[in-house]
Amino acid sequence: MISDINALKYKKVLLKVSGEALMGDKQFGHEYDVIKKIAIDIKEVIDLGVEVAIVVGGGNIYRGINAALVGMDRASADYIGMLATVINALTLQNVMESLNIYTRVLSAIPMMSVCEPYIRRKAKRHMEKKRVVIFAGGTGNPFCTTDSAAVLRAIEMNCDILLKATQVDGVYDSDPKKNPDAKKYFTISYKDVITNNLQVMDTAAIAVARENKLPIRVFSIKEQGNFARVIQDKGEYTTIEA
């Protein structure tokens, strides 16, 4: 453990966790053992003295874009997807609080009975008080992904880096699950991610990150302790930057 926060390169970070990461090997919903492991990883980073914010996806419950493909109005489908992210945020909060991690859920869609509405200054104040802020509801707008929400919230919170937790250990030139010869990038530019149409994040999210010089690090959430390792420039990952 690093006792001196000044020894760390990244002191304020945003972690993007996909909905799929929360369901483990299930086809739908939550795998609580997996969520607890993620919460333990987050606690390890907090114990280093790092301020942590989180954006959760909702794909383990509902995917708006898939519903739109079968005829549902896209805006309506996206709003349902935003509600799914609130379910995930509250689930993650509950597991984290069982480990004595102070958290607050802030939703871009106001739901006063279950969580706080997203207010930038309030979110920053929570982080200053060493609370983990979990952002739910995406951006609050349809036609925007939770990756875009993660980039926006990271910039608004003045985070040093965005860490995207995925099912693979970085960015590849093709799907490593389908192509055993897929090439892994250790560093790659925003421009190359967009030009090569790499599916690590949607183009809008990458473009906003590039414009605001927000570095993105992609790593695997599957291996216990990876979050803390990646924060300290250890382990396997890909960095996306200028």
Swiss-Prot record:
Name of the protein described by the UniProt record: Uridylate kinase
Family recorded in the similarity comment: Belongs to the UMP kinase family.
Pathway entry: Pyrimidine metabolism; CTP biosynthesis via de novo pathway; UDP from UMP (UMPK route): step 1/1
Lineage: Bacteria, Pseudomonadati, Pseudomonadota, Alphaproteobacteria, Rickettsiales
Keywords linked to the UniProt accession: ATP-binding, Cytoplasm, Kinase, Nucleotide-binding, Pyrimidine biosynthesis, Transferase
Chain's role: Catalyzes the reversible phosphorylation of UMP to UDP.
Highest taxon above the source species: Bacteria
Source species: Rickettsia conorii (strain ATCC VR-613 / Malish 7)
Compartments it resides in: Cytoplasm
Binding site for ATP: 16-19, 59, 63, 166-167, 172, 175
SUPFAM superfamilies: Carbamate kinase-like
